[in-house]
Amino acid sequence: MSSATSSTDRLPTAAGDAALQRLRTWPGEHRVAVGLSGGVDSSLTAALLVEAGWEVEGLTLWLMSGKGACCAEGLVDAAGICEQLGIPHHVVDTRDTFQREIVQRLVDGYREGITPLPCSQCNRSVKFGPMLDWAAEERGLPRIATGHYARIRHGGEQGRHQLLRGLDSRKDQSYFLYDLPQEVLGRIVFPLGELTKADTRGEAARHGLRTAEKPESQDLCLADHHGSMRAFLDAYLPPRQGEIVLSDGTVVGEHDGIEHFTIGQRKGLGVAWREPLHVIRLDPAMNQVVVAPRAEAGQRSCVVGAINWVSIAPLQQPLELEVQVRYRSEPVAAQLTPIPHTPEDEARQRPHRCRLQFLDDQFSITPGQAAVFYRGETVLGGGLIQRDDQAQTNRE
């Protein structure tokens, strides 16, 4: 008998029991590869699937050399969980892919004056798709499961797989999953989607998992790996001094790299001024950080490109919805309108774009971050915020 069986003599919590019932009645084959990072969320995901009677194998992606959740430390903890649960553990070396698709693109983005969102790109190009391919081709497993706090509803509009927020609003990760294509969403299981973090800790303790009290990572994995985001950027981008200026060109300070600033930032500017200033633009061509008082920093619209439509078909006419423009930001009301394709757009095969029109001024509309569209708890789609010279701001 595996330790997973012997460690579950205690009855599950109400939330844990509901999760087990959902897994036991899940349609289709109950055979799955679990993406294991070595943290408590993925550990409990594997434990619940084992307890629910699924055929489970652990799969860990080796993303980086060194220490941290995506490095050797995570591999050791993931292997220990698989041993405890009595399931096979596989490690796939994806360091080259991660360096090329995530690290280099992240560095390039910061160099160009945008603030990239590597987690969503990593989910699409490094994690979910490759994990599904590996599980099917190498182990004959039709599904993967992860410890994300999100939900999937099958059979939505036009038979689409719909992505929903996790029930724990403080841990909901749907914002980072908006870019997953339909063929991937149809083969994913999120056992923790209706649990809170407290539920997860409690269930992990019930199973006696070694990761039950493991602290959460508090930052981007690359920042954890290097000690801080600044240290990561300094390792790839040499200091390049430039000016901090007002929107009229008045020089108010100096900086050592635009990559260390983001739109909406107020603290840490190193500028003494008669009123608080906010970053409103990063200009890589001039190597300038442009700042302004809050009264001049509001923005009413932005352009969104590289859109992935999740729960609805591609938009053909304006739509009222809610949009979230940063992971920790609150959703706000907006209208989304398709931008007509020009002959030049067609000739260059540019992807379709949409314009977001906000009802109220927004102060952290950041090129490179995702704008994720919601209707209630359902993710309609999302895309990347682009630079937009036509954005309507209070400065005009």
Curated annotation (Swiss-Prot):
Belongs to the MnmA/TRMU family. The active site is at C122 (nucleophile), C221 (cysteine persulfide intermediate). It comes from Parasynechococcus marenigrum (strain WH8102). It catalyses: S-sulfanyl-L-cysteinyl-[protein] + uridine(34) in tRNA + AH2 + ATP = 2-thiouridine(34) in tRNA + L-cysteinyl-[protein] + A + AMP + diphosphate + H(+). Catalyzes the 2-thiolation of uridine at the wobble position (U34) of tRNA, leading to the formation of s(2)U34. This is tRNA-specific 2-thiouridylase MnmA. The record marks H148, Q369 as: Interaction with tRNA. Disulfide bonds join C122-C221. GO terms for cellular component: cytoplasm. GO terms for molecular function: ATP binding; tRNA binding; tRNA-uridine 2-sulfurtransferase activity. Residues 171-173, 326-327 are annotated as: Interaction with tRNA. ATP binds at G35, L36, S37, G38, G39, V40, D41, S42, L61, G147. CDD domains: MnmA_TRMU-like (cd01998). It is found in: Cytoplasm. It is an enzyme of class 2 (transferase). Its EC number is 2.8.1.13.
